[in-house]
Amino acid sequence: RDQLTLDRIGYLTQFPQYPDQKFGDFVPRSGNQEGSGVLGWTYKCKGWETDPNAYAYIILQRGAKDFELAAKAFGFDDWLTNPDFNTADARDKHKQAIYDRIGQWAIDKTKYEVTDILSKAGVPVAPVLSTKEIMEDQSLYDGNTLVKIDQGGKIGEFVTVGVPFTISNYQPVYGPCPELGGNT
């Protein structure tokens, strides 16, 4: 989609290069930037100096009501009347100022505090999690998002992806993989 837009109009408003830099004929790498038409970014949170995963991913949606909820959750009510921020098109042109201010807001909060504050306001947000943090989250096992399999032998127990939803009375059976030649 981004490539089609770039080919058609020559720029991508949701990318950090807009409006100050020229676009080539391919979609540029976007770093921490969401590339889908919304202002999404990965922000440093409290502890980032020693924890490589002390970040939260926050999305500012384009809709006026969604942006109002986000601005109020941040305590940035001034954005609602500031012509640099009070429309989606204006925000596209001033995205670096948005990233900077939200970054200052997030830096003294843990990724879980950021997630708690913003999710209560309906702002799309999530903590950046390591594989270890994901594997230690019991709720993911409770809902079959992750399952533990005891393979036995040298492999022992390992974690894999489960089926976290119901399909017409189908209940998946989890168990060890067949040994080499064991399923022939």
Describe each PLM feature range:
Residues 119-140:
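Conserved PLP cofactor-binding pocket of PLP-dependent enzymes
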Residues 154-184:
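Flexible, small-/acidic-enriched active-site or ligand-binding loops
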Residues 42, 57, 126-127, 166:
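Structured core elements
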Residues 37-39, 119, 160-163:
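A generic structural signal for well-ordered coil/turn residues at beta-strand boundaries
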Residues 54-56, 121-124, 163:
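A short pocket-lining beta-strand/turn micro-motif at the edge of beta-sheets
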Residues 1-112, 145-155:
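Acidic, glycine-rich segments within the central catalytic cores of soluble metabolic enzymes
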